[in-house]
From Swiss-Prot:
EC nos: 3.4.24.-
Oligomer and partners: Homohexamer.
Protein residues bound to ATP: 257-264
Organism: Salinibacter ruber (strain M8)
Name of this chain's protein: ATP-dependent zinc metalloprotease FtsH 1
The UniProt record lists the keyword Manganese: no
Family label: In the central section; belongs to the AAA ATPase family. In the C-terminal section; belongs to the peptidase M41 family.
Taxonomic classification: Bacteria, Pseudomonadati, Rhodothermota, Rhodothermia, Rhodothermales
Positions of region (Disordered): 661-686
Family annotation (PROSITE patterns): AAA
Record topological domains on the Cytoplasmic side: 1-33, 186-686
Database matches in SUPFAM superfamilies: FtsH protease domain-like (SSF140990), P-loop containing nucleoside triphosphate hydrolases (SSF52540)
Keywords, ordered alphabetically: ATP-binding, Cell inner membrane, Cell membrane, Hydrolase, Membrane, Metal-binding, Metalloprotease, Nucleotide-binding, Protease, Transmembrane, Transmembrane helix, Zinc
């Protein structure tokens, strides 16, 4: 048996750092330097010592006998000496003759020459005295009788022992074990199991400047945000340029934008361009169930940052700790408030010339505490929006740079097909296209792979094996044809680029895809056209089959939401007037219960919304009755071909009456796809 005894963490540290340690031994010494290895080794050594102690005690312990057997041995003259300990335990010694003649039970003898004197330890025995028996009187009577017969009497004595060791083991050991376990879990929970990230050692938290750097070249698009943060880079590179004139750069930069737009990547690029350490942490990492843990982590983080200055601290999802204190319904917890207070103190407690820049990201700036946004803290806010067409093309070029592409792949065409896509979504499309090409055994990623990847990302995975009855297929085909025809002939709708009755995703039974126009303002006529197009599927069902199905559930939800927004938010109702009740934009620190309008106004709003939806439904049904032959022909073609692209739609419906599809004339090969799908579910075909 071989044992490895570890003396102390300091000894291991000195050995690991010795020059004799070769490169191959470094992982071993790194493991041995862990405190867990030290404690495990100590526990193994302690268990070994306890095991050896038990074995030794068993080897030297006297043989135990029954009390009745003890009394019989006394009467037979086999007992030489008796010691009564604390009135209960009896330790005795047999006579040598009784042991030699095997009159009594003893432990096995050790190896010894013949005729040797019997070992006294072999003659020892022990038993336990019942409380009711008077052993002393019994031994006196035995000795008196033995004197008359000439037999040797039994020597006996009563003693008292204080078993403080047993008491200590009985009470102290369990108590110490419980306290140790409690302290261990308290420490683990206080650090969240991340002692190596926050606290005395933040090596894993900080990415040093010597590693692989992310630069502005890796961040496609975001031209305006990069210009804003370029000043931070210049400050970290040459701080004296600003300090010599007495100016101070803002120490806090808040990046605001939707998810996936590149906020974290931009912060890393700032650190990479400046060549300084970068600390990235999520706002939720500060939060624990124990009060004071979050504040302690904030202090440790800023202490480490000051030691590594110049550096950048990036807090992702800062709204996790920066929410408004004392919000409606007690929105802030005590721990979060303490953490936020400590963050405010730290941000207000160091000078800008220390070289520590704090960057944070959130997609909920409306819920942040006002003290966090005041001058001197996060006083510079940079908005990061979803990329436009030119920026999307640049992002596609970055993500396809490592792919083996076919000559048919055009980033400009892909950018035109993906309005509203963020950088993370574009990266997902490129990755899906590469996986599809590999699955098909191709040597390069083709444009068709990107087309299929777009369908998969927007509408879900194709479910070609889903069983649909012929009657339901006819309903789905007319439903999607109704969407396409209404959208094709209205002025303010998005161009229809694809119609499909192939089931996709978890619930889509069919879908009509549109290419959204990149615009920010919508008139009342534009919103009415969009609602009319959404009701085209239900209208086709009513006209052809005389009834509506549950397939229009999602369409009705979108229409209802748009109609309420027109009346309540945008003031587009002549009956209600140009009023906005901000129903979708309540402030986080506003009152929890607020009645924005009277019951009479609520009833008027409901009636106006119903009138708007009925108007859109009537427009859709009138247009579909006018185009009934085209509706039936398109549905039949969908039942045969399952998918109709733009070229097939133009051949079937003719040129759009409100202008050609300019992007189709450019010959970019996008007639097979689009960017936005009106998906379907079991209760909504699209």
């Amino acid at each position: 048996m071989c044992f490895c005894i570890v003396s102390s963490p300091e000894a291991m540290h000195s050995n690991a750092d010795s020059p004799s340690s070769g490169p191959g031994l470094q992982p071993v010494w790194t493991t041995l330097r862990s405190p867990y290895v030290f404690w495990i080794g100590g526990a193994i050594l302690l268990a070994l010592l306890v095991h050896l102690g038990i074995k030794w005690q068993q080897a030297s312990a006297p043989v135990r006998i029954e009390y009745s057997t003890f009394l019989e041995h006394v009467e037979s003259g086999y007992v030489e000496r008796v010691e009564i300990v604390n009135g209960k335990r009896i330790n005795g010694t047999y006579t040598a003759a009784a042991v030699q003649n095997d009159r009594v039970e003893t432990r096995p003898p050790p190896a010894a020459p013949m005729g040797a004197v019997v070992d006294r330890s072999r003659r020892a025995f022990a038993t336990h005295k019942p409380t009711a028996h008077e052993l002393t009187a019994f031994l006196r009577r035995h000795n008196e009788a033995a004197t008359g017969t000439g037999t040797a009497p039994v020597t006996f004595a009563a003693t008292q022992e204080s078993d403080w060791v047993g008491t200590l083991l009985l009470w102290g050991l369990p108590l110490g074990l419980i306290v140790g376990i409690w302290l261990f879990f308290m420490r683990r929970m206080a650090t969240g199991g991340r002692e190596e990230q926050i606290g005395s050692d933040t090596a894993a938290l900080f990415e040093e400047a010597g590693g692989r750097r992310v630069t502005f070249d890796d961040v496609a698009g975001l031209a305006e945000p990069k210009e804003e943060v370029a000043e931070v880079v210049e400050f970290l590179r040459r701080p004296q340029k600003f300090t010599r004139l007495g100016g101070a750069l803002p120490t806090g930069v808040l990046l605001v934008g939707p998810p996936g737009t590149g906020k974290t990547l931009l912060a890393k690029a700032v650190a990479g361009e400046a060549g300084v350490p970068f600390a990235s942490i999520s706002g939720s990492d500060f939060m624990e169930m124990f009060v004071g843990v979050g504040a302690s982590r904030v202090r440790d983080l800023f202490d480490q940052a000051k030691e590594r200055a110049p550096c950048i601290i990036f807090i992702d999802e800062v709204d996790a700790i920066g929410r408004t204190r004392g919000g409606p319904g007690g929105a802030g917890t005590g721990e979060r408030d303490n953490t936020l207070n400590q963050l405010l103190v730290e941000m207000d407690g160091f000078d800008s010339d220390e070289g520590v820049v704090i960057m944070a990201a959130t997609n909920r700036p409306d819920v942040l505490d006002a003290a966090l946004l005041r001058p001197g803290r996060f006083d510079r806010q940079i908005s990061i929006h979803k990329p436009d067409r030119l920026e999307r093309a640049d992002i596609f070029r970055v993500h396809v740079a490592d792919l083996r592409l076919d000559a048919s792949v055009d980033p400009e065409a892909l950018a035109r097909q993906t309005p509203g896509f963020a950088g993370a979504e574009i990266a997902n499309v490129c990755n899906e296209a590469a996986l599809l090409a590999a699955r098909r055994g191709r040597n390069a990623v083709q444009m068709d792979d990107f087309d299929q990847a777009l369908d998969r990302v927007m509408a879900g995975l194709e479910r070609s094996n889903k069983l649909i009855s012929p009657e339901e297929r006819r309903v789905i085909a007319h439903h999607e044809s109704g969407h396409a025809i209404v959208g094709w002939f209205l002025e303010h709708t998005d161009p229809v680029v694809k119609v499909s009755v192939v089931p996709r995703g978890l619930s889509a039974l069919g879908h009509a895809q549109h290419l959204p126009k990149e615009r920010d303002l919508y008139s009342r006529e534009a919103l009415m056209d969009r609602m009319t197009m959404a009701l085209g599927g239900r209208g086709a069902e009513e006209i052809v089959f005389g009834r509506a199905t549950t397939g229009a559930k999602d369409d009705l939800e979108r229409v209802t939401e748009t109609a309420y927004a027109m009346v309540v938010d945008y003031g587009m109702s002549d009956r209600i007037g140009p009023l906005s009740y901000n129903r979708a934009e309540r402030r986080a620190d506003g009152p929890l219960f607020e009645k924005p309008y009277s019951d009479a106004m609520a009833a008027a709003i409901d009636e106006e919304v119903a009138d708007i939806v009925r108007e859109a439904r009537a427009r859709a049904n009138d247009l579909l009755r006018e185009k009934r032959p085209l509706l039936d022909e398109m549905a039949e073609r969908l039942l045969r071909e399952e998918v109709l692209g733009v070229e097939a739609l133009v051949a079937l419906l003719g040129s759009p009456p409100h202008g050609e599809y300019a992007w189709l004339k450019e010959g970019d090969g996008t007639s097979r796809n689009s960017a936005s799908a009106e998906g379907a579910s079991p209760s909504s075909q699209g």
